[in-house]
C-alpha cells in the first residue's frame, strides 16, 4: 500500500513537470510567432519599403529640381534689380567723387556731400543705372558723349559696368558704345567719346 502511494506521488510530480514544460513550449511558440513575420507579411513590408524608397527618391529629385529652379530665380533676382548706394571716386587730380546737382549739372567734388551719393541699380546683366539720391535725377549720356541729368529713366541712362584689372570700374554707355563717363583733373566731366577705358579719367571706385 505504501509503495503504491509513493509511485502515485512520483507519477503526479512527473506529470506536473511535463505539463509545465508543455506550457513553456506553447508560450515560447507564441513569442516566436509574434517576432517572426509570415512570408506574406514580409512581402507586404518589402513592398511598402520599396514604395517608400521610390517615394523618397522621387521627392528628393523633385526637391533638387526645385532647388535648381530656385537658384535660377535667385540669380535672376540678384543680377537684375539689386540696388547699391555708393560714391564713385575718380583718382585724378586731387581725387573727385561724381555728383549730380539739383539743377541737372554733373561734376566732380573732392569732398563727400549728399549730392555725391548715388544709387547704382542693375537693370540688365552687367548694365546699371546711376541715380542721384539727393537730387532724384538719373545720370544719362547723349549720342555726343555728353553727360546730363534727367528725372525719368530712359535708354540713355544705361551704362555697362566693367571691372578693370586695378579693381576700379569703367562706365560705358550701353546705347552708344565706346563712350565713357570721365572726369578731368579739375573735376569737370569730359566728353565720353574723347576718352577710353585705358585712361585713368574713366576709372571709378565705388565707395560706401
UniProtKB/Swiss-Prot annotation:
GO annotation, cellular component aspect: cytoplasm; extracellular region; extracellular space; sarcolemma
Gene name for this UniProt entry: FGF6
Family affiliation: Belongs to the heparin-binding growth factors family.
Protein's name in the database: Fibroblast growth factor 6
Location(s), subcellular: Secreted, Extracellular space
Keywords carried by this UniProt record: Angiogenesis, Developmental protein, Differentiation, Disulfide bond, Glycoprotein, Growth factor, Mitogen, Proto-oncogene, Secreted, Signal
Record: glycosylation sites: 45
One Pfam entry name: FGF
Subunit-structure text: Interacts with FGFR1, FGFR2 and FGFR4. Affinity between fibroblast growth factors (FGFs) and their receptors is increased by heparan sulfate glycosaminoglycans that function as coreceptors.
Source lineage: Eukaryota, Metazoa, Chordata, Craniata, Vertebrata
PROSITE patterns assigned to the protein according to its UniProt record, in alphabetical order: HBGF_FGF (PS00247)
Organism: Homo sapiens (Human)
